[in-house]
Regions:
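Bacterial N-terminal signal peptides
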Residues: 7-16
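Boundary at the C-terminal end of the N-terminal hydrophobic targeting segment
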Residues: 18-23
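Short, non-transmembrane alpha-helical segments in secretory-pathway proteins
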Residues: 25-68, 123-130
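Exposed beta-strand-loop-beta-strand "reactive/processing" segments of non-cytosolic proteins
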Residues: 52-95
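Short, aromatic-rich amphipathic segments at membrane interfaces
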Residues: 94-128
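Juxtamembrane interface at the cytosolic side of transmembrane helices
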Residues: 131-160
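Primarily membrane-embedded glycan-assembly and transfer machineries that use lipid-linked glycans
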Residues: 158-165, 169-210, 221-385, 392, ...
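Transmembrane helices and adjacent periplasmic/lumenal helix-loop junctions
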Residues: 394-420, 439
Length: 517
């Protein structure tokens, strides 16, 4: 009996292929989509975040489109509203029917407005324990604990109050985040103007802690910051642009007009949105695109040359060790410069206090953890201030700072008239400024036609930035929906007043103290 069953089983196994032979196997295709176009649109429009934002626009202006991504099984939904353009976009999961992403207003065009976790600086610096730890160290280390309602303590709290704006920024709530940054900015502007006019700060007592304790805290905080940068930070597009610019200079090109773009043959994978950043560039290399990265002054790229020459660049937007090297260097040089400034103008206590203030302030670490070039302008101003009695050094510092990011060019008239408005020191300042400017712009000589290179520089930097729209200030918000004011006229008026004020401080006061400088 057992032999019969075994023989039958073997026969069935052998017969199986023969029985299946007459018909070809039918390939298994991808499963059909579950939702229809209309259903995907309706689900997205019912999302609370989307519906709240769309309420700002007349429904008759809405135009909605939905496309299905077969590979990832989701619907991409886009909504337009007349002249406002695209006002909402997101994803609907086809399997569950849930809205997996919903971006509205400024979040549509600006991914940095979406509040993605750790997008700026990494998750560690943005975590509550680390951030609030820096806040506590900064306040307790510098506060006048004997007088809790002193002006010094108010100044410190205002400096820390930018945390509220950052908290909303990290949630992707730009419409709330941006206005919250203006009250502390206005306070600090008024505070500095009043102190400069009076010639004294009026903050009273020095920190209560002994020098050795502040010095120890400074060393500890500096080491902790270094560890955060090396192990728990990221490099945003600003730091990436510095490395690209250094690469172009080292290879005999001006950075302007030579940044990697998304036009050549793809040489890397596409992301979930179908965007392929890595492309073959005109130099034949596979590089990650950063098409608008050449918008800063020349010093913003030249300062990355040491890091690039030491650590190189793969062509990709990867860990970018050269950017980390530069960012850490900028940070430490600011600390050293502040210590020297304090030592020169106030002795050991002020030296330690200024260094401590930098390493304890959370936003300086935010800059370091994001590996940007934002520490460069203050770096040159700090060292120029240290050498304030030498007009040429002030000129060099003002020029290098201004040709990194153009805003600090406003300090040039003030610095040119220190300690008083006299022709000879002003001329020496101008010579230092001119020499530093020529050195900074010498990279334009790397191009076959320096005049054309200068025009490209203008077009890629100030020419582009003047008309650039951004959601990270209130001036361009009118584009988003009805009810938001058009502030462009006010912006132009304030810009003119700012330039007038920058020129006026060359003349008033006639004699200036280091504090006023």
């Amino acid at each position: 009996m057992r032999r019969a069953l075994a023989a039958a089983a073997i026969g069935l196994l052998l017969a199986g292929p023969a029985l299946a032979a007459p018909g070809k196997p039918k390939p298994l295709g991808p499963p059909e989509q579950r939702l229809t176009v209309a259903q995907a649109k309706a689900i997205f429009l019912r999302n609370e975040k989307v519906s709240d934002w769309l309420a700002h626009y007349p429904q008759r202006l809405w135009q909605t489109d939905a496309t299905f991504d077969q590979d990832h099984k989701f619907w991409r939904v886009n909504v337009w509203a007349g002249e406002a353009g695209e006002v909402a976009t997101g994803k609907v999961d086809d399997t569950s029917g849930a809205v997996s992403e919903a971006w509205t207003g400024p979040q549509v065009a600006w991914k940095m407005a979406r509040g993605l976790p750790g997008a700026f600086g990494g998750k560690e610096i943005n975590s509550a324990p680390v951030w609030l730890g820096f806040c506590a160290l900064f306040f307790l280390g510098l506060a006048d604990l004997r007088r809790p309602f002193s002006l010094r303590n108010l100044d410190l709290l205002v400096l820390l109050s930018f945390t509220v704006s950052l908290w909303f920024f990290n949630r992707g709530d730009i419409i709330t985040s941006v206005p919250l940054a203006y009250p502390p900015l206005l306070y600090l502007l008024g505070r500095m103007a009043w102190s400069g006019w009076r010639g004294r700060l009026g903050t009273g007592a020095v920190p209560v802690w002994p020098i050795w304790l502040l010095a120890a805290a400074t060393v500890f905080a500096a080491g902790f910051r270094l560890g955060l940068n090396v192990r728990a930070s990221n490099v945003i597009d600003v730091g990436y642009s510095g490395v690209i610019g250094a690469n172009r200079i080292a290879n005999g090109q001006s950075p302007y007009g030579h940044f990697p773009v998304e036009l050549g043959k793809a040489c890397g994978p596409s992301d979930i949105d179908g965007e392929t950043r890595e492309r073959i560039q005109t130099n034949g290399r596979c590089e990650s695109a950063n098409p608008q990265g050449d918008t800063y002054g020349p010093v913003a790229y030249e300062a990355y040359l040491p890091g690039y020459l030491a650590l190189g660049w793969t062509g990709k937007w990867d860990d970018l060790p050269a950017a980390h090297f530069a960012s850490i260097g900028f940070d430490l040089l600011c600390v050293l410069g502040l210590a020297l400034v304090g030592l020169r103008f106030g002795g050991q206590r002020l030296a330690v206090t200024l260094a401590f203030a930098w390493v304890a302030y959370p936003f300086t670490q935010y800059v370091s953890s994001s590996n940007t070039n934002d520490a460069l302008p203050p770096l040159f101003l700090i060292w120029g201030f240290w050498l304030a009695t030498w007009p040429a050094a002030r000129g060099v510092g003002a020029a290098l700072s201004g040709w990194t990011k153009f805003g600090s060019l406003l300090v040039a008239p003030l610095w040119a008239s220190y300690p008083e408005r006299r022709l000879r020191p002003t001329l020496v300042f101008a010579v230092g400024f001119l020499v530093a400017t020529l050195a900074a712009f010498s990279i334009l000589l790397l191009e076959p036609n320096p005049v054309h290179a200068a025009r490209v520089f203008w077009d890629r930097t100030l020419g582009w930035q003047i008309d650039r729209e951004s959601p990270f200030s209130i001036w361009d918000w009118r584009q988003y929906h009805a009810g938001l004011p058009d502030l462009h006229i006010l912006q132009r008026v304030l810009e003119v007043l700012l330039i007038v004020a920058a020129l006026a401080v060359y003349f008033v006061p006639r004699r200036k103290s280091p504090l006023q400088l």
